[in-house]
Swiss-Prot record:
Alphabetical UniProt keywords: Acyltransferase, Amino-acid biosynthesis, Arginine biosynthesis, Cytoplasm, Transferase
PANTHER family assigned: AMINO-ACID ACETYLTRANSFERASE, AMINO-ACID ACETYLTRANSFERASE NAGS1, CHLOROPLASTIC-RELATED
Protein source organism: Vibrio vulnificus (strain CMCP6)
Gene for this chain: argA
Top-level EC class as recorded in UniProt: transferase
Pathway: Amino-acid biosynthesis; L-arginine biosynthesis; N(2)-acetyl-L-ornithine from L-glutamate: step 1/4
Keyword Acyltransferase attributed: yes
Residue stretches spanning the membrane: none
Stored InterPro entries: AceGlu_kinase-like_sf, Acyl_CoA_acyltransferase, Asp/Glu/Uridylate_kinase, GNAT_dom, NAGS_kin, NH2A_AcTrfase
The protein's name in its UniProt record: Amino-acid acetyltransferase
């Protein structure tokens, strides 16, 4: 009798919510030349194919920096850099095109494999490349002519979406044509970032040399807001060797992730190309493995003060009257106002949530979550949740829980799962209202 491991079954079951959540979503993946040259590249390709088979719409952007350098070295040639951007003259352009063309064919061939006894057995992927991106020259900066180094002029999002809807993987490289028929060398990080923004992608994913953004203790930072990511960028720009792969690839992608999030891409992920299965672990497991930069809002998110009491009452009173929220008096709000986080727009409070920590149990309750009816079509509930998670982690909280009668599905979509009354902190358990019969859901941090 064969001994069967339950680990596979358990992992497969736990991934189901993420499979459902990602199905039909558009994700832009950046594979730098360093990732393609790594021994783990074939596993990355297998994981991208798996994502596609699970219904994810994939745009794959590749770079060619080390491959270009290798070809230049063979010819005993070098290209100058200006502000960390390669100056691509007429002589080096042919080498850049050669490297990019070889990688395009190699990636397409890898995605086309469907041999038996391989992870891609039975897959039949269509890979589409073309002039989806139109370029223009960077021009002259501080007296330096970038020649055939360029930037994006426009992106044919309609054509890309049409290819994605037909089930194809769209493959984009660092070479793009201009309206004059010339070729230009683009930064792959810029291509990935701008494509994600223009497509209004759900995720931007970058394979980098590190596991993500690494803190001073050597651990990957799981989640960053754009403002926090910018602080890391400033620090790393000073501390890191400007000629290193981290500076040229990871740091540049992190800047792109910040730009993408601020332009409306909900999440950008940094994962290591050296770790087998990093892509699957990041997207289809609860804990993830890398760093994600999550969307911040142009609206102000801040801790509430006493002057906000009237606005909070105006926001939550209709929900209290409907029985969705537990009624709070003005006096109670005045006493607890420091526990509230609000979203403010043009002087109007359009969202709020409160955090009640139970330090001894390392738990915290997220309560009184409310969004103004005119602003419920965005991601403001998720924005408040992200702030609550960030705030909870800073004070050593390991689990957030909520009591809800009407929003069970929304919280479950965010990774919460149902727990019993006995799992509540002792002080909260004694206050549980059995007549209201609120569902209790928890989210480990």
């Amino acid at each position: 009798m064969k001994i069967r491991s339950t680990a596979l079954v358990k992992g497969f079951r736990q991934s189901t919510p993420y499979v459902n959540a990602h199905r039909g979503k558009t994700m832009v993946i950046l594979l730098g030349g360093e990732a393609i040259a790594d021994k783990n590249f074939s596993n990355i390709i297998n994981d991208i194919a798996l994502m596609h088979s699970l219904g994810v719409k994939v745009v794959l952007v590749y770079g060619a920096r080390p491959q270009i350098n290798q070809l230049l070295d063979k010819q005993s040639s070098q290209t100058p850099y200006h502000k960390h951007i390669r100056v691509t003259d007429e002589n080096s352009l042919s080498i850049v095109m050669q490297a990019a063309g070889q990688l395009q064919l190699a990636i397409t061939a890898s995605l086309s494999m469907s041999l038996n006894n391989t992870p891609m057995a039975g897959t039949h992927l269509n890979v589409v490349s073309g002039n989806f991106v139109i370029a223009q020259p960077l021009g002259i900066d501080e007296g330096v002519d970038y020649c055939h180094s360029g930037r994006i002029r426009r992106i044919d999002t309609e054509a890309i979406n049409r290819s994605l809807d037909q089930g194809s993987i769209v493959l984009l490289g660092p070479i793009a044509s201009s309206v004059t028929g010339e070729c230009f060398n683009l930064l792959s990080e810029e291509v990935a970032t701008q494509v994600a923004i223009k497509l209004k992608a759900d995720k931007l994913i970058g394979f980098c040399s590190e596991q993500g953004v690494i803190d001073e203790e050597g651990n990957a930072v799981a989640e960053l807001f754009p403002s926090d990511a910018e602080k890391f960028i400033q620090k790393l720009s000073v501390d890191v060797d400007p000629d290193s792969d981290f500076h040229s690839g990871t740091l540049r992608f992190l800047k792109g992730a910040v730009a993408a999030c601020r332009a409306g891409v909900p999440r950008s992920h940094l994962i290591s190309y050296k770790i087998d299965g990093a892509l699957i672990q990041e997207l289809f497991s609860f804990d993830g493995i890398g760093t994600q930069v999550v969307m911040a809002s142009a609206e102000q998110v801040r801790q509430a003060c006493i002057d906000d009491i009237g606005g909070i009452l105006e926001l939550i009173r209709p929900l209290e009257e409907q029985g969705i929220l537990v009624r709070r008096s003005r006096e109670q709000l005045e006493q607890e106002v420091e526990r509230f986080t609000i979203i403010e727009k043009d002087g109007l409070i359009i969202g709020c949530a409160a955090l009640y920590p139970y330090i001894d149990e390392h738990m915290a309750e997220m309560a009184c979550v409310a969004i103004h009816p005119d602003y419920r079509d965005g991601n403001r509930g998720l924005l408040l949740l992200n702030y609550m998670k960030h705030r909870s982690k800073s004070i050593g909280i390991e689990q957030i829980f909520v009591l809800t009668t009407h929003s069970v599905h929304w919280f479950r979509e965010q990774g919460f799962y149902e727990i019993g009354v006995d799992s509540l902190p002792m002080a909260k358990k004694s206050l549980y209202n059995y007549q209201r019969r609120s569902k209790i859901l928890a989210l480990p941090l």
